[in-house]
């Protein structure tokens, strides 16, 4: 697992590896060792990419172990204040929108970098899709599927949701947005060890989307969280809900109407060159990253990165809490992208 761990690749420190972290878990749980700051740092620096799970021949459930450990840590030690504030915002969609607008003004004035509180590259200034409500349903038809819009994605990257709805509508599929009724999926709360908060979000989502329709997700982290509600909530209803959650690529590949749409545009504008970068939670958690390739291959020439799916370092809130490690992982990923496109004059990164 060591070559697949971004923090071990950066630090070379065994304590910053999956194997080392599991050893530290055992030292406290089985041997009664007292946690010190180095012990806490080992878990704080884990990005949670789960690349180690994919590489592990023994199928050690590292994701479950790290979440359980962080939950135990949180019961003894509160997470950083700025993380708690950020996670609280995710529970209030309107407040998140207004807060993002305020931060966007600070960003536009060039003041955000001076504060050192948030990375300047976060797209606070992204505009919402025009008239997103008009895209909810096609011509008054009952929606066949629900698009999970979440919290941050809906505020900072609404164009992704709009593009998904455009594609599905073009294929003749009516779509309904989950909107604020469902809200946040709770993934970041669970990763932070705030299990009770994660459960509250999961209960809200499952209650809002309980009518049996497929739930499509265009964010890998959200999709992974929704697919794990059965484990998190431990109920029959939660397992039923998770069984009808699909990553958007996964669902589109299996839908004949989308396949027909793809076939209709094949060759119309030539074959673009696309470099594929897998989100960790699509590749290592949901394990449905091949569906991206299956969807694109008929209409594009694909280039694979040479890093075997190594994490980009973003990790949700990780880039805010561990900026140096996140930047080092990002630099490695950017170098891999540059190697992939060095001989191409025009490419798209997907």
What does each model-identified segment do?
Residues 62-350:
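Iron-sulfur cluster-binding electron-transfer modules in prokaryotic oxidoreductases
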Residues 30, 55, 193:
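Short His/Asp/Glu-rich catalytic/ion-coordination signatures at enzyme active sites or charged loops
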Residues 1-5, 11-12, 19, 166, ...:
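Short intrinsically disordered, low-complexity coil segments enriched in acidic
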Residues 7-41, 59-85:
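Non-heme iron-sulfur electron-transfer modules
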Residues 3, 23, 41, 104, ...:
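Generic structural signal for well-ordered, non-membrane alpha-helices
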Residues 1-9, 36, 40-60, 309:
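Cysteine-centered iron-sulfur cluster-binding motifs in ferredoxin-type domains/subunits
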